[in-house]
UniProtKB/Swiss-Prot annotation:
DUMP binds at residues 56, 181-182, 223-226, 234, 264-266. One of its GO terms (biological process) is dTMP biosynthetic process. The gene is Ts. InterPro entries: Thymidate_synth/dCMP_Mease, Thymidate_synth/dCMP_Mease_dom, Thymidate_synth/dCMP_Mease_sf, Thymidylate_synthase, Thymidylate_synthase_AS. The modification Phosphotyrosine is found at residues 39, 208. Its EC number is 2.1.1.45. It comes from Drosophila melanogaster (Fruit fly). This is Thymidylate synthase. It holds the Pfam family Thymidylat_synt. (6R)-5,10-methylene-5,6,7,8-tetrahydrofolate binds at residues 226, 320. Belongs to the thymidylate synthase family.
Length: 321
């Protein structure tokens, strides 16, 4: 089903007009993006009340434990507006996951560099992977989604038909047993954690079908949530994944629920985020899938169109490696 943008949605309600005072009619105020306000409120809470902790990267964080946000995807797409989010990188990384790939060089070839720091020679050697080729991240997200339980060799090996294809199982269950409470996809595999350049931060997704409304919703559990850089990407990524699965199963997107464990702000992100907190959220854009796609593996970046995206400028934040 090809999604067509609609005008308004419950996540972007219009502010009430002021009472008539006999003067010229008041102009309607801009919509309020309540979903993004919840993200900003969580940032404020962490900066004001978070516990200062040292972490793996030695940068240090302000951290709280156990947070949740909810995004309504029925009439808009949750791409944050208080800073520009690089949607092409979000989409290309997700398509890389869906393809079961673990070679960061494939993303580099598309000018997407979000995995460069964790796949460099220096980083791999530091993590003890001295015999692993540059770019080979080990059995990370895509491998677990498509080949859970298979024996990992290198990023260049052919894993066709090996392991459990969790993504395919999710789609088949949505089609054939939509009320199942076990529509789950996990990237957390304790046997493979020691082989990964970086253990999965976003660990487990559960999908929920409302047959009454014909909607697909997703809840993500994320063990480690970098609110400045990672979380805006993760929101958009799992929202896009839900749209894609809904599209190939004949459903409409519903809610994306984002549940987080260690929810943190890196200390070197505090000042940039204070700048972001001074900005007023704008309405979320819409996502259009431009053609009918039958199989999840057939999506290409060119199939996605983001419309009416009017974000504030980019804010520079350094990635903690």
């Amino acid at each position: 089903m090809v999604l067509t943008p609609t005008k308004d949605g419950p996540d972007q309600e219009s502010m009430p007009l002021p009472a008539d005072n006999g003067e010229s009619p008041s102009k309607q105020q801009a919509p309020v993006n309540r979903d993004e306000m919840h993200y900003l409120d969580l940032l404020r809470h962490i900066i004001a009340n978070g516990e200062q902790r040292m972490d793996r990267t030695e940068v240090g964080t302000l951290s709280v434990f156990g947070s949740q946000m909810r995004f309504d995807m029925r009439n808009s797409f949750p791409l944050l507006t208080t800073k520009r989010v690089f949607f092409r990188a979000v989409a290309e990384e997700l398509l890389w996951f869906v393809a079961g790939k673990t070679d960061a060089k494939l993303l580099q070839a598309k000018n997407v560099h979000i995995w460069d720091g964790n796949s460099s020679r220096e980083f791999l050697d530091k993590m003890g992977f001295t015999g692993r080729a540059v770019g080979d991240l080990g059995p990370v997200y895509g491998f677990q989604w498509r080949h859970f339980g298979a024996q990992y060799g290198t990023c260049d090996d052919d894993y066709s038909g090996k392991g459990i294809d969790q993504l395919r199982q999710v789609i088949d269950t949505i089609r054939n047993n939509p009320s199942d409470r076990r529509i789950i996809m996990s990237a957390w595999n304790p046997l493979d954690i020691p082989k990964m350049a970086l253990p999965p931060c976003h660990c487990l997704a559960q999908f929920y079908v409302s047959e009454k409304r014909g909607e697909l919703s997703c809840q993500l559990y994320q063990r480690s949530a970098d609110m400045g850089l990672g979380v805006p990407f993760n929101i958009a990524s799992y929202a896009l994944l839900t749209h894609m699965i809904a599209h190939v199963t004949g459903l409409k997107p519903g809610d994306f629920v984002h549940t987080m464990g260690d929810t943190h702000v890196y200390l070197n992100h505090v000042e940039p985020l204070k700048e972001q907190l001074e900005r007023t959220p704008r309405p979320f854009p819409k996502l259009i899938i431009k053609r009918q796609v039958q199989d999840i593996e057939d999506f290409r970046f060119e199939d996605f169109q983001i419309v009416d995206y009017n974000p504030h400028p980019k804010i520079q934040m350094d990635m903690a490696v």
